[in-house]
């Protein structure tokens, strides 16, 4: 069957009556971005649905695959659009049914009619189409309770639409409708997943990464660039901010007892992220912390670390099991990159016996003897920024940076 349109159903946008047009326009823009550089389509949107016209030579399957990954899309279907003429509708229904024709296969016609002026009511239309299919196709039988396939027909104001497939979308809200956050992006499994999870709620992210050459390698930096590109595949450009962290990290290990260095390191990172977030007008920080997963992610550690900022910290992975996070990482395509064996600055100086319940007053007293604020200001001033998109040649970006 040659389809001529792809039907895109909105998710939670239907609940946003006051801002619906803003959400729809953003979703339309995001879908157009996701479809680059494909050809043979035209995106049309209204308050209830979005229809993507496709030409005969368009790659319909690839178009649907890409659209289904865009946040804000509830589901997609390849559809045939015909005039609201019963004979044309019958003819198209039979053609659709031939695609599923096989011995023992059952079907059901499910009709919806938003155009109440159409001469057939829902029940009558279902009977007409079901009878036409049974008269023309040998093997199919009707099962209204548990069919193998549903043939769906929508009678709308402009035309009739027929389809038999419904492909689940990514859900959530369109990226760009929920404000800006700053993602603390390591090279590990968790933080890219956290970034995707908040983007699903319509939030735009910029990412900040701490690197400590020569203790961290250039390959570790490249890995973070690659992770950013993967996250940007369906959401548009993402700015990646690279923080020189070597001097601060060396000073921490010189001035702070070993079992508190992890806590102090995280505090300095958070101070830098806090200051930079305010510069770019980000309203919250995001990280991949998971309660109890490591020493720095116990409640006691979080309390001591969080004391340096009053910005909201979003932790979308807080209560997930590691296996659940890994599944999500594989689904979004970051897992294989995340497990590349290049250490980041969080792992190179890991103490043997880190404090899991550090006292805030003790951490502050050890830090007070050093002018970390001046070092933080210098680190923020020397941040390097890359703008990454799915079209970015990340290897070239990396070489240009060097």
From Swiss-Prot:
PROSITE patterns: THUMP (PS51165). Its EC number is 2.8.1.4. One of its GO terms (cellular component) is cytosol. The gene is thiI. One of its GO terms (molecular function) is tRNA binding. It catalyses: [ThiI sulfur-carrier protein]-S-sulfanyl-L-cysteine + a uridine in tRNA + 2 reduced [2Fe-2S]-[ferredoxin] + ATP + H(+) = [ThiI sulfur-carrier protein]-L-cysteine + a 4-thiouridine in tRNA + 2 oxidized [2Fe-2S]-[ferredoxin] + AMP + diphosphate; [ThiS sulfur-carrier protein]-C-terminal Gly-Gly-AMP + S-sulfanyl-L-cysteinyl-[cysteine desulfurase] + AH2 = [ThiS sulfur-carrier protein]-C-terminal-Gly-aminoethanethioate + L-cysteinyl-[cysteine desulfurase] + A + AMP + 2 H(+). GO terms for biological process: thiamine biosynthetic process; thiamine diphosphate biosynthetic process; thiazole biosynthetic process; tRNA 4-thiouridine biosynthesis. It is an enzyme of class 2 (transferase). It comes from Macrococcus caseolyticus (strain JCSC5402). InterPro entries: Rossmann-like_a/b/a_fold, ThiI_AANH, ThiI_fer, ThiI_N, THUMP_dom, THUMP_ThiI, tRNA_STrfase, tRNA_sulfurtransferase_ThiI. It is found in: Cytoplasm. Keywords: ATP-binding, Cytoplasm, Nucleotide-binding, RNA-binding, Thiamine biosynthesis, Transferase, tRNA-binding. Belongs to the ThiI family. This is Probable tRNA sulfurtransferase.
């Amino acid at each position: 069957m040659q389809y001529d349109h792809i039907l895109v159903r909105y998710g939670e946008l239907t609940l946003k009556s006051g801002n619906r047009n803003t959400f729809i326009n953003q979703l339309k823009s995001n879908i157009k971005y996701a479809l680059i550089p494909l050809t043979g389509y035209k995106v049309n949107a209204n308050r209830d649905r979005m229809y993507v016209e496709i030409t005969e030579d368009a790659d319909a399957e690839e178009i649907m695959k890409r659209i289904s990954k865009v946040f804000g899309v509830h589901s997609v279907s390849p559809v045939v659009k015909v005039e609201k003429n019963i004979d044309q509708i019958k003819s198209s229904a039979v053609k659709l049914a031939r695609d599923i024709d096989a011995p023992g296969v059952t079907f059901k016609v499910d009709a919806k009619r938003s155009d109440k002026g159409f001469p057939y009511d829902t029940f009558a239309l279902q009977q007409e189409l079901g009878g036409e299919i049974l008269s023309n196709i040998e093997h199919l039988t009707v099962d209204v309770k548990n069919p193998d396939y549903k043939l769906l027909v929508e009678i709308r104001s402009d035309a009739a639409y027929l389809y038999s497939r419904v492909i689940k979308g990514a859900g959530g809200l369109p990226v760009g409708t929920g404000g800006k956050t700053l993602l603390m992006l390591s090279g590990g499994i968790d933080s890219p997943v956290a970034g995707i999870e908040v983007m699903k709620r319509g939030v735009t992210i910029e990412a900040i990464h701490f690197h400590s050459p020569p203790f961290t390698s250039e390959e570790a930096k490249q890995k973070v660039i690659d992770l950013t590109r993967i996250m940007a595949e369906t959401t548009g450009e993402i700015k990646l901010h690279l923080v020189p962290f070597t001097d601060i990290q060396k000073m921490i290990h010189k001035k702070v007892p070993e079992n508190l260095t992890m806590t102090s390191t995280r505090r300095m990172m958070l101070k830098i992220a806090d200051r930079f977030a305010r510069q770019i007008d980000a309203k919250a920080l995001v990280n991949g912390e998971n309660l109890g997963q490591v020493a720095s992610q116990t409640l006691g550690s979080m309390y001591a670390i969080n004391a340096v900022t009053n910005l909201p910290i979003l932790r979308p992975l807080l209560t997930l099991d590691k296996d659940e996070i890994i599944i999500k990482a594989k689904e979004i395509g970051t897992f294989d990159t995340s497990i590349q064996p290049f250490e980041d600055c969080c792992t190179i100086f890991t103490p043997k016996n880190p404090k899991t319940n550090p006292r805030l007053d003790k951490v502050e007293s050890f830090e007070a003897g050093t002018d970390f604020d001046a070092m933080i200001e210098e680190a923020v001033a020397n941040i390097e920024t890359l703008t990454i998109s799915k079209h970015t040649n990340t290897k070239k970006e990396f070489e240009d940076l060097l």
